[in-house]
Each structure stands twice: as structure tokens, then as C-alpha cells.
């Protein structure tokens, strides 16, 4: 999908995966669409008021983290040990400031922790207990790990462990938001629970600046979803931005080219992006991807590849 230019724009995703992500459960599909609408409305309201892209992407991502339909925050998938470990990153294209966290177990809002680290921390990336301690000392809400765990996720873990190496970890997962504000500044945010039955300490592409998340006012803001190991190897988000900066591809061409490269390695997934001029694009190589867009003309959400965006 590719749209023309407008004053501001917000694009979000709730993960790319197999077609069964919603077709098997109409109630889940309705809840997921409502969750996308809620996140779009909140982020769009910020941009309509002339506020910043970084505020918009944090707000949209925070709402998606709170929605148990998506694999981020509450409702995330479980590790091999039956716990939730969360990853998140945020980046401001105006300054290229960034914050990233991984292995989060007790901080309710990982994306807000990533922003707090970006704005007030001494480092760009914190992991594990140190990141949760930074969150606690920064006044961010702490919860028991059980807060994030849903019975359905325990069932999925049991199935994955029983299937062993035959299990397919790419169902759906990760949430993300990219935005351009009225001043032409772009920002990106990505948050995830990872993949079901992941090994303790596994880190995917989402919190890695340049792999799953990237923003640069000279090019675009990008958020990724999919088989993280392949997106890391392709440095996917930065590669989209680099192709734009070279000036030889449109935003849509850059996304399609990077996804094709990832597919050649054996990976699948999706990307969303916006440019400082207000252009927006997305693409995915799976049968479905939760996604939505808001601009001055309205809002739209979609899931399946056959759906046509307005």
C-alpha cells in the first residue's frame, strides 16, 4: 500500500503472521480491529493537535501493549520457561535519539520505559533486571510477571513444547507505530513479547535500532514485524532508510526490496514506514498483517492481504 502526501500521518501494525490469526476466531478479529482503531484514534488526536510524532507513536504503542489481542505487553507469548520477557524500542527521527530495552519482566509499559531511557538514561540500550530497576527508579509502574500471562498463551506454550522442532513460531506478534507530525518530524516505536517457547534471553529484531526500529528525518521512520532473526541479519529498518537516502527508490519500493531480500534468506514478515513529506507505505510477505493508518482524511484498519485500504 502507498498513499500520497498529507500534513501528518500515523501508521500502526499489530504483527504479521499466518491467515489463521483471525479467520479461526471471529471474536478475536473484532477485538483486534477495535484495538487498532483505539490506538489510531489516540495517536491521531495527538497529531491533530499539532503535537509531536514521538508522543503519537508512544501513545499508540502503549495502547496496543495493553490490548491482550496482540503479542506485546499484557498477553505476550511465553518463553520456554513459562515467563514473559518483553522487548521494545523507540526512536526520534529529528535527533536520532533512541531508547531500547529487552528481557523486561516487571515493567508494565515497555515502550514508555524505552522512551524514558532515551530521554533520561545514560545509555541507549538496557537489558533484563537492570532495565526493570531503571524503570522502577524512574517511577514507571511495576507488576508481577503473571500480570502479562493469559491462559491462552500457556496453552500455546504447551503445544509448542509438545511439537518440538516442528512448531511454527511465526503466528503473529509484535506491535509498532510510525508517524510524521505537522513539523515533518518522524518517529518509530516497536514492542513485542517475541516468539512462543523462545530460549531464555533471546532477543529479536524489535529492540535493535536499525533492525526492527529506525527513524531518521533524512529518510523515514520504520517498524518491523516477523521472523526477527532474519530481520536482524538484513538490518531491515535501516536498510529501508538507506535506500531512501540514496534517492533511487520510493518508500514502497524500498520496503518491497527489503522484504524480498529477507525472503531470499528464508524469513517472512512485514514493514511499515512514513517519510518526513507525509508519504506512507507498508508491505508483508505473510498472508495477513494487523495494520492501520490515520491522517487528516480519516482512519482505516485491515488484516488480510486481500483487503483494500482506502
Task: Describe the residue ranges of each PLM region.
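Alpha/propeptide regions of enzymes that mature by internal proteolysis
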Residues: 2-310
